[in-house]
Amino acid sequence: LAMAGEPFRMAFPKIIGVELTGRLSNWISAKDIILKMLEILSTKGNVGCMVEYFGEGVETLTVPQRATITNMGAELGVTCSVFPSDDMTRAFLDAQGRGADWVRLEAGPDAEYDRVVKIDLSSLEALAACPSSPDNIKSIAGLEGTKVGQVIIGSCTNSSYRDLMIVAGMLKGRKIADDVTLAIAPGSRQVLEMLARNGALADII
């Protein structure tokens, strides 16, 4: 119907508000935020819902970090995930030469949610999703000593320029163990070209 120009009606989704406070500690990433969400909400029971992130903690997250979180909304089973369009968004678009496209979008002070989840970014610890479900969340500290045979860094969750610069710093001057395979997939050609220009790509490969 929509392709023919007719209205397409759907049920208004339930809205889960996620209030973020504080700031991420060193070595804690946006991936840990969405893994915490999976620990709280699981992968079941969220169909027909959307997630809206708000709160002072949002201002501390870059656009690539927000993209990591919203991309993994699929693992939650939600219809969509949204962040406000704020000054951080404008700075990102300016850097891409698209500043004229920026529009401020944010929830009003009287916004209401069907459920509110609160996450203190300052208290988050490093997390991992273990087999065989994205909501089988474990603390990294509790996985010490686990044998690793394959490492994949990339997809929509670990492939930004910042992510791969951290990887390059960790791998510089080191060698992958003979019984471990490592694959890296930059999130875009732009990221790949930036890594090549600054020499970080050589540290990775």
Name these PLM-found stretches.
Residues 1-205:
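Fe-S-dependent hydro-lyases/dehydratases of central metabolism
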